[in-house]
Amino acid sequence: MTQYAILTDLNRCVGCMACMVSCKVINGVPIGSYWNKMLRIGPYKRKDYKTSNDVDMYYLNVQCQHCENPKCVEVCPTGASHKMADGTVQIDKAKCIGCQFCAMSCPYNVRYLNKEERVVEKCTLCEQLTSQGGLPQCVAQCGGRARFFGDLDKGIESFEAPRNAYKADREHNDFQYDQLFEGNRITFGELGQPYDKQTEVHHLPNAGNDPSFVYVLRDREWKGDE
């Protein structure tokens, strides 16, 4: 069974928000709404100190996790929210009645009501691209080269990102999006730094929905459960 997901190497993420901007542009997300959000985790200030004694920080991107057992699908009264064969969770706008039961059941607060269309929207994992063999736009445009896309059933080492974007010399300025298709990619296993699979691979809090997205964070305290 296929389960598409995104892996984010949080040690590489620089918080540039290119993922947020590119997502809004390609999907026509309304002003004030986001399919992809960027959170700054830390530094934390203790109440008995004027300055922080914990200067460690990182950026955490949050979007629809395309869960293995999505609660949004369970509560949808019309079947508008449904799980696809590729593991993604999608919304059939023709069936959506805007009741927002799905948004209320989502533990990550990543669904919103499009007030003009009166339907709920969220990250589609760029179905229009991935169904044609492409990469999600947030992966293709990641400024820190921190995001990778793949099938969990094949292991996170096989997750892919654009290969050309990693060239240090930048001699070629004619790079086109269609070059990001199969044959011109690099895997997380090839590029990623060593990590502990037991202690440095994380998910957002599991509320019985089994989130699919993976976060790798080395040598720092994971605070994504807070």
Regions found by a protein language model. Give the residues of each.
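Non-ligating segments of multi-cofactor redox enzymes
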Residues: 1-226
